[in-house]
C-alpha cells in the first residue's frame, strides 16, 4: 500500500461506522472521523490493551484487539484506524 492510498483510505473511514467487542464487562469501539474510542474497557477488573494493524485495500482494515485477563482474549474485527489502550 502506498502512502497516498493509505492517507486516502484513512481520511475516508465511512465504510464501517461502529464495531463492538464484548467480554468481561465489555468494550465498545466507536469510530469517529479518524479515531477509535474505548468505553468501559476495564470492566470486571481486567486489564485491556488494544493495538491496530492494517491489511487489505481501500477502506478495509483489520483491527486486532487484544487484552490480558485471567482468561485471556484475542480477537480481530474490521474497523478504521487508530489505537486505544485502557487499564
Swiss-Prot record:
Gene that this sequence comes from: hssl54
GO biological process, one term: sorocarp development
Record organism: Dictyostelium discoideum (Social amoeba)
Listed name of the protein: HssA/B-like protein 54
Family under the similarity heading: Belongs to the hssA/B family.
Amino acid at each position: 500500500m502506498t502512502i497516498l492510498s493509505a492517507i486516502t483510505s484513512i481520511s475516508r473511514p465511512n465504510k464501517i461506522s461502529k464495531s463492538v467487542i464484548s467480554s468481561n464487562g465489555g468494550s465498545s469501539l466507536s469510530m469517529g472521523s479518524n479515531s477509535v474510542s474505548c468505553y468501559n474497557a476495564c470492566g470486571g477488573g481486567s486489564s485491556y490493551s488494544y493495538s491496530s494493524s492494517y491489511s487489505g485495500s481501500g477502506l478495509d482494515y483489520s483491527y486486532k484487539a487484544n487484552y490480558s485477563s485471567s482468561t485471556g482474549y484475542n480477537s480481530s474485527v474490521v474497523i478504521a484506524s487508530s489505537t486505544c489502550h485502557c487499564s
